[in-house]
Amino acid sequence: MEGPVSPDGSTPPTSGKVFFIGSDLQPHWCTGTAVQTRYRNIVATAGHCLLDTEAPAGPLFKWVFVPGYSEGTTPFGLYVGKQAVVHYAFDDVRDHDRDYAFVNVYNGVVSSAPDVLTNVGRLADNVGGQGLEFNQPLAPTVDVLGYPAGPNPDGSLPYTGETLERSTGSTFAMKVTGLPADRPIGVDSPFTGEGSLGSSWLTHYTSDSGLGYLNGITISVSDTDGDDRYDAGVSPYFDGELYAIYRSAAGLWTGSIA
């Protein structure tokens, strides 16, 4: 199966930025990924890129996905979130083993004239969608795709957050202090945290198709060797409970907002 490619032909448009307003009433963003489903309308991201964990429980404001984002461009339009499914354990007690979300978005829109929005169709029809793997042994390697922007602990800024970055690394079981999770997974990756949260971990990914299987989502980063540079991403393990959340979201239709 051939997936669509970004205008520059080098990065998969299934990845993009998720923009929202936080409890501080300021704009923020994460990374999100279009996933294949019946209604072709789902974005996968970290749970805390959907639910406000800094204030009383509730969804973040003005949530929108921009697939294929690059240096301010919106090549495939804007996809506004309509509804989402998260695990009750993350919503209720902030269990980061369940820090994932599947968001149903309306059809994409573009501004065709001042104050006029034009419907450009369903998300996965326009950019394709990644598959999903769960209940699998740890993959030997995964490709991590995201928009890192923040600093390393030493203050260096290796990324701008304006273009999609890709790293390939080995996965491993890990323990993370300060993060309420019992069985997080690590991947060797130099991504910094800010902006890369929500990044996709893809198995069997090929550059030619831009497609693979989603098998992890970055919820944190870690400096495992203490050199003041992040060298690992952290994800929940994708098990049957994650698949149940995905299945619930996959059955929800959205339609047009234009």
What is the predicted role of each segment?
Residues 2-22, 36, 62-123:
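Conserved catalytic-core segment of clan PA serine endopeptidases
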Residues 10-70, 171-177, 189, 211:
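Catalytic histidine site
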Residues 13, 39-41, 138-141, 182-183, ...:
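Loop/turn elements at helix/coil->beta-strand transitions in domains of secreted/extracellular proteins
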Residues 24-25, 39-41, 49-52, 70-73, ...:
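Solvent-exposed loop/turn segments at secondary-structure junctions
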Residues 32, 45, 65, 103, ...:
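Terminal peptide-recognition signature
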Residues 96-100, 106-186:
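Chymotrypsin/trypsin-fold serine protease catalytic domain
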Residues 123, 215, 224-258:
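C-terminal cap/linker of serine protease catalytic domains
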Residues 190-217:
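Catalytic nucleophile loop of clan PA
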